[in-house]
Amino acid sequence: MTTAQILEKMIVFSEGNLHDIDHLIRVWTYAKTIGELEGLDSRTQYILETAAITHDIACPYCRTKYGNTEGRHQEEEGAWIVRDFLRGTGMDEAAAGRVIYLVSHHHTVTGVDGADYQILLEADYIANAEENHWPEENARRFLSSVAGTESGKRLIREILLPGQEEADRTRAGQVCESGS
């Protein structure tokens, strides 16, 4: 299946939940953009985009089973749900295994073992921060402790910390001027 076909399948799977659909499209768009800017090879890009589209596939099930969509529940339940979802897509076993791994780790910021994993974390963070209006301090913390790609860092700065670099340069200039 093409990425567009997987996206369509996931939209159908989402059963009209506009919040979930909007979020997966945001994450996919950011992941696609960062992956392309970082120059991922086509196979890794496809795996990344598929993982971005399906990363929250367990949310409907978690809402029913647990009454919430906490990250740990998404990671636990997401593996088997995305495995079933990927059947019949024509994705080879190794690629499907990687997508399953990414979906079942997309809230774990330690042990990042590839550009696809790193970019998925960054894309999901940007989308969540936008949707939930997280404070700038959270973005600065993520930027310094989790963000790893140059493209992801640029997008975080531009989207979540607009004007921050200019303000930092201005403050630095004022400090230099007053310190002379």
Task: Identify what each model region corresponds to.
Residues 27-30, 72-88:
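An active-site-proximal "capping" alpha-helix that borders the catalytic cofactor pocket
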Residues 19, 44, 70, 74:
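Conserved acidic
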Residues 45-67, 78, 82, 100-107, ...:
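His-Asp-centered metal-binding catalytic motifs of divalent-metal-dependent phosphohydrolases/nucleases
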Residues 12-41, 54, 91, 107-180:
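Divalent metal-dependent phosphate-bond-processing catalytic cores, especially two-metal-ion Mg2+/Mn2+ enzymes
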Residues 93-100, 112:
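Active-site-proximal substrate-binding core of FAD-dependent oxidoreductases
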